[in-house]
Amino acid sequence: MASLLQGLSASPGSGLPINQDLLLMQKGMLMRKVRSKSWKKLRYYRLQDDGMTVWHARQAGGRAKPSFSISDVETVRGGHESELLRNLAEEFPLEQGFTIVFHGRRSNLDLVANSVEEAQVWMQGLQLLVDFVTNMDQQERLDQWLSDWFQRGDKNQDGRMSFGEVQRLLHLMNVEMDQEHAFQLFQTADTSQSGTLEGEEFVEFYKSLTKRAEVQELFENFSSDGQKLTLLEFVDFLQEEQKEGERASDLALELIDRHEPSDSGKLRHVLSLDGFLSYLCSKDGDIFNPTCLPIYQDMTQPLNHYFINSSHNTYLVGDQLCGQSSVEGYIRALKRGCRCVEVDIWDGPNGEPVVYHGHTLTSRIPFKDVVAAIAQYAFQTSDYPVILSLENHCSWEQQEMIAHHLTEILGEQLLSTTLDGQLPTQLPSPEELRRKILVKGKKLRTLEEDLEEEEEEPEESELEGEQEAELELEAQFESEPQELSPRSKDKKKKVKAILCPALSALVVYLKAVSFYSFAHSREHYRFYEISSFSEAKAKSLIKESGNEFVQHNTWQLSRVYPGGLRTDSSNYNPQEFWNAGCQMVAMNMQTAGLEMDLCDGLFRQNAGCGYVLKPDFLRDAQSSFHPERPISPSKAQTLLIQVISGQQLPKVDDSKEGSIVDPLVRVEIFGVRPDTARQETSYVENNGFNPYWGQTLCFRVLVPELALLRFVVKDYDWKSRNDFVGQYTLPWNCMQQGYRHIHLLSKDGISLHPASIFVHICIREGIEGVES
């Protein structure tokens, strides 16, 4: 068992060659940690010998504490990409600064080195380690995980572990074990009889801890000799249990080649118990169907036929009143596959518009910085179109600057006219709009008028009259959502701000209009117009006119946004709006929790491209579907989930050394109202390492096409609310049957490898007599 650095600096074939940057990082360097213009402090940073963690101290030789793990790092950026470091460019050369970007919602770490050379050492060294960790295979990740635990358990850092150190480590690893049994395993692993465990001996000790009786029993059920699975036996398992069907024979050969550790086993086309376990724990044995991982849906249908991953107040990385506005909000949203971002624009100093949450204490960022970030990151995760939802509060002059920045910075990426210059009859498809950025906002004229032959420019007074007739800035109809009626519109105070023609012209397929009624929309609106709904208004429409809302969303786009009282940036449940076919259900992406788990779960499929094709009954203009009262269709199904066991569940609170989790598993179904249900297992006392439940849960689902499953592991507490341990959410239609592992994620959606739960999934057609 080698540490990462040993792997990096060893002989060829063991990883990366010896690297001077990493050796210098191990010696440590004094750098300046920057949080704001007023908070800049010297810290001594050092890469630990394990090659996986960076510690810091106030000075060289001072008391050090962990700063971050390499596995937590997503990427490293140069100083010129940090808005904070750019603001300090007069104080520190940008070339000496760099930013460490973490997975999830953890704040970036901005550092300034003493020289350009030292900054390069850390930037290059860190990125080298990040790339190495990212490309680790399943076994390498497990080896590194074991190495991390060995480092934590080896208190005196002498490279060996006494039985006392092993006992402490077992508590850290969530293992409650009889001392006599633990000592017996310890002695068996101590082949050198030194009274301590060294690297490979510790690995053997770990293997004895992690023997999976339930997997061995399953293996022996299909193995004639209990030692191996022949090719035919493995094919039987894949067909009978894993429901792999006709492809089982070819798949069996692939899986043996991929997972059987012995070369002789591969040659004989047999699978050992170790190979069988490797298969079950790998992506091949995952609950998420691999056929749903790439782009597998039809991407040539009109935009309104898709659910679109959408963000609310994208610029905020905190709450709605005092939170920080940052281009980082856009970068994070786009990199996680978001395809619709919101830009709230106000007049700024020196003629430059700014982005912030108006009439609040949130900080302000230049609009041009936001556009530059969007230009850079729009298509790093997905090639499919990005929608800029503009909330325009600016004067005529600064609107011209908005149009200028959009045109100049986005260039060819910006869609400024219809695709072929002709009047379309429906919205274009994501495929047709690849790598294009669309503007959603108010528009002075219709698309038909825009596409007419060149006419004499209208007088400004005509524009103002036209504006008064039809324009209300988006801010007005979003802050006072669609309780308007055509009559009450006249009583409403007019907004006299004039929309700049240059900005209006950039709105092509997504003209924002106020919603009055479904009948009004059918009579007066066109397919390229889009209405926004507050969550309260959308809920009311679903309840009162659910089928009309579904039909409305078959020909026009709808955007739903969180209510104004959510000042803490909390989220609503997006599922009820997806049930009505609403395409753009905007989420506060900076806030983790159940609601974002559902959003991440839906958009996990289709390569995470941000577009998911709606079910056929949400695309049919004559659909009779009502999300509140779905008639039981022929596609109704019954789900049987046997929750078998858990593996290496993390501690809820690392500060409580003696505490061990009492895990239970809750399975939740989200979909149409009759399908929404939850059930949970009993809890297992004092065992987060390898708990066993062996309990079966049963659900009936009327509309599986809309259902999401969320698996949650909780730490039972009889005195208070159960603590969250981990979760995983996926669409019903992406679930694989059979014996599957569910690899858990943190609240922030980060892998908790190797934490997982082992289940058996069985789906039966039709409704069986079960209560859920």
From Swiss-Prot:
Membrane topology term: Peripheral membrane protein
Residue ranges constituting the PH domain according to the UniProt record: 23-131
Organism for this UniProt entry: Sus scrofa
Catalytic activity annotation: a 1,2-diacyl-sn-glycero-3-phospho-(1D-myo-inositol-4,5-bisphosphate) + H2O = 1D-myo-inositol 1,4,5-trisphosphate + a 1,2-diacyl-sn-glycerol + H(+); a 1,2-diacyl-sn-glycero-3-phospho-(1D-myo-inositol) + H2O = 1D-myo-inositol 1-phosphate + a 1,2-diacyl-sn-glycerol + H(+)
Motif (GBA): 220-250
Residue ranges of the motif PDZ-binding: 741-744
Free-text domain note: The PDZ-binding motif mediates the interaction with GRIP1.
InterPro entries linked: C2_dom, C2_domain_sf, EF-hand-dom_pair, EF_Hand_1_Ca_BS, EF_hand_dom, PH-like_dom_sf, PH_domain, PI-PLC_fam
Enzyme Commission identifier(s): 3.1.4.11
Annotated binding of Ca(2+) 5, by residue: 715-717
Gene designation: PLCD4
Entry GO MF terms: calcium ion binding; G-protein alpha-subunit binding; phosphatidylinositol-4,5-bisphosphate phospholipase C activity
Name of the featured protein: 1-phosphatidylinositol 4,5-bisphosphate phosphodiesterase delta-4
PI-PLC Y-box domain residues: 503-619
Listed cofactors: Ca(2+)
Residue sites binding Ca(2+) 3 per the record: 313, 342, 344, 391
Organism superkingdom: Eukaryota
Active-site feature positions: 312, 357
SMART domains for the chain: C2, EFh, PH, PLCXc, PLCYc
Positions bound to Ca(2+) 4: 660, 662, 686
Residue stretches making up the C2 domain: 619-746
Gene3D superfamilies, alphabetized: C2 domain (2.60.40.150), EF-hand (1.10.238.10), Phosphatidylinositol (PI) phosphodiesterase (3.20.20.190), Pleckstrin-homology domain (PH domain)/Phosphotyrosine-binding domain (PTB) (2.30.29.30)
Assembly: Interacts with GRIP1. Interacts (via GBA motif) with guanine nucleotide-binding protein G(i) alpha subunit GNAI3 (inactive GDP-bound form); low-affinity interaction.
Annotated stretches, region: Disordered: 448-470
Feature: compositional bias, Acidic residues: 449-470
